[in-house]
């Protein structure tokens, strides 16, 4: 139950954050006392489990029923969503594939000719959208930590990471690959 509620709340927050326009404050609704108590109970359970939840917002009919900012969460700052992004990004790729906008067999480098390193390895050249989706892009370790705090151009940084294994050969959890999928969908 708690996991389901968390997923629902995280999904609502993510969907709301997809619109980058700032149209001012969202309208507010009135939550029932029962709903507010349930949310307070949920947040207490999250805290008791030492989970690092930064923010939560629940909307109904376009109105905010519940909103809380904790830890690193701030209402006026962009927030890294980490693994929540994987579900929505892969869904966006699925829609793009079903609409014929891309194929899972498209080469990753074909989307970013302006961001390629001076020398493109055979493994990087062989990397496809499918490899990003299945986290088998050829990296031996997750390169995500190389970029998100220090680099401005994540696409160039990803493409510059050595692809030491043949794509499709080895699984490596790779959040950076999810970013690349989002960059491909945006193209």
Question: Which sequence ranges carry the predicted segments?
Answer:
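Short, basic/aromatic recognition patches
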Residues: 32-46
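Catalytic-site signature segments of enzymes, centered on catalytic residues
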Residues: 75, 142-187
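C-terminal motif of bacterial Sec signal peptides marking the signal peptidase cleavage site
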Residues: 15-17
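Bacterial lipoprotein signal-peptidase II cleavage site
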Residues: 19-23
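Sec-dependent signal peptide recognition
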Residues: 2-8
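Active-site SXXK
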Residues: 62, 79-105, 132, 181-186
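Active-site helix/loop module of the DD-peptidase/beta-lactamase fold
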Residues: 80, 99-137, 160, 187
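A short, well-structured edge-of-sheet supersecondary motif
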Residues: 43-73
